């Protein structure tokens, strides 16, 4: 088909009387004068080549490195290819060089008969390659196949003429092999690719168009109305095949796919051929110059004629719409010429020549404003402006203006009004207001003391108002009224309205006061009866508990495992771990005995050192008095108790409720509430001696505490707390909590503040440097408080009671003595159960961590962290 077109072009050139010129290619245009006739063929081919070069951005073909196949003609932008022999010899070059225009005309006349049988539709289109329909939508597959067969026949004829015909059998075999590889989707071997290259180069044809040539625009006869929805109401989003969105596609360079379709399936990358495949496609595919690669799917898309035309119009700076008429006749809707005759000739209305009523009302308002002085005339305005511009004079002293104001009373307060007369002052009062003889006699007796009288007059009754005589006390009452107005001071009292919210102190948020225990972490189970007491080792690794099941248990804190159980033979009411970290010793109050137990936990050398220290009793030169020997006895332990860890037994004459250690770990005190003046006894471990500090009973003693720094002893009775100096043996202070029964107390690590719990649900904070009365009382429990405790390191304190709750509070004590302690309740931990109206018995803090332990009537010990 292409050859036939070229021959037709050459024939037209011969008819136009062009001079014969030698040509070097069969596809080269013959003469410049023939540009108008073949503007839709040859220029379009050069346009195709230039557009292909701009898309590929290549100066020359990558496969044509030596320039053997293609030759550029600088005069015409048309690419021509030379046909090579299979041996690589250039035979046609000499023959084509000698070809004249007469020979071309002769060949065109011989082919006239063949051209008559061609399809008429070929002349209407610029090129069959540039059809709008894609291969999937084209219905004329049979016509395309027939065109391809005609092209192949023409190529074979030309090859025969040039002496390049190949054996048909070898060509059929090569096509069969190519079809086999294409059906298996496998790349072609190099020999088949080279064979296809030879077939392509044998024809020496390449369809091109010029870049400056536009496809023919269909002629329009008038402007027909177009339906904007004729092509279908679609959107850009529906045509998108890859759903990855607007992202850089180089993110998928390392993967086998380039995204996902609407069914969430991977879009596999298209296979990329090598340079040979690219060259074959460039030579064979007539749509190669208009084929672009979709960056989102990797598929090759063939641009239609409309797309090519749109690109060319945009590149040349023209309107993208091909149907838009740039030179459409202008319609001047509004003329610029001045009309000499009136457009409308309506007669004037009556109001156009009558005076306006609105202006009449406005003038009336102006006149009224001038009469009232609100509006100034021009002369008046000039006079006021002249006065304003005159120099102004001021008084030297400001008091000259304020003489009249000084004569007046500043902030005058009105005198109180007199009381209105009552029923007793009436001329005809009711009978009950009249005096009887007894009341009249009493009124007369107070003549010397008139201010004590119930009334300053005697009520009288008259029949009519005419019978009322003159008032004898009128002048005197007027005079007293004047004295009141003159002498009685009057002033205004400013009352400050204070809201209830201002009386409540502003406390910080608990979030700002962390860390403090918030959740239950571990539960220590093993006792069979209620647990009354608990104590923690100074290093914070073990705890000891005492219970009504007559046992003392040693627990490991981190695992909640019971390490050792020591039976005592009686109810254990108090346990205390020795605060001295150099020895491992626990004091337990069980019945009338105090047991000093080596728990045998922790450092082995420390356990052995404790046993060596308690093995032999030191010799004492002093002799205890009779009242001490009758109250307490230091005894040895049996073999069974020794195996359990008991080292020393101290027997008292009454039941021991509490045992507490001194800070150094050598002294400890015991409390026997029924012991009268011997209720409190202090024992020395190093000398194995005991002493009674008091000679008289001051009340029923509940508990005692040693001061953490000073040699002081705090003794709590039912209603008072006494502070004794152990060196001077004097009472230093007596605290008055104002309660009926004290249950427990704890002292701050610094020693300046004391915490007291009562059976009356009240928690009291004492500042020992401030007062002997409570600094603050907290009513945060709903039942009796059993135990209170301070944390050794953190500003925390806790209280436990029979309402199942352990309340952790923030108690900050400042070094500045002028600043009061800050007390903020933080957390209520309510996990224990109520058994026989009892719940939580004891509470104690961990020595180093913000943890708290509690023991209760439900036979458990709970750790809160």
From Swiss-Prot:
User: Where is there biased composition of kind Basic and acidic residues?
Assistant: 160-180
Which InterPro entries does the UniProt record give? Answer: BOP1/Erb1, BOP1_N_dom, WD40/YVTN_repeat-like_dom_sf, WD40_repeat_CS, WD40_repeat_dom_sf, WD40_rpt
Report whether Cytoplasm shows up as a keyword of the record: no
> According to its UniProt record, where is this protein mainly located?
nucleus
Recorded hits in PROSITE patterns, A to Z, give: WD_REPEATS_1, WD_REPEATS_2, WD_REPEATS_REGION
Q: GO:BP terms for this protein?
A: maturation of 5.8S rRNA from tricistronic rRNA transcript (SSU-rRNA, 5.8S rRNA, LSU-rRNA); maturation of LSU-rRNA from tricistronic rRNA transcript (SSU-rRNA, 5.8S rRNA, LSU-rRNA)
Name the residue ranges with Acidic residues bias. Answer: 30-44, 57-79, 87-159
Which Gene Ontology cellular component terms are annotated? nucleoplasm; PeBoW complex; preribosome, large subunit precursor
Query: SUPFAM superfamilies recorded for this chain?
Result: WD40 repeat-like
Q: Which domain of life does the UniProt lineage start with?
A: Eukaryota
A Pfam family it matches = WD40
Q: Tell where it localizes.
A: Nucleus, Nucleolus; Nucleus, Nucleoplasm
Q: Where are the WD repeats?
A: 526-565, 567-607, 651-693, 696-734, 737-776, 780-819, 835-865
The free-text function statement in the UniProt record for this protein reads:
Required for maturation of ribosomal RNAs and formation of the large ribosomal subunit.
- What protein is this chain from? Ribosome biogenesis protein BOP1 homolog
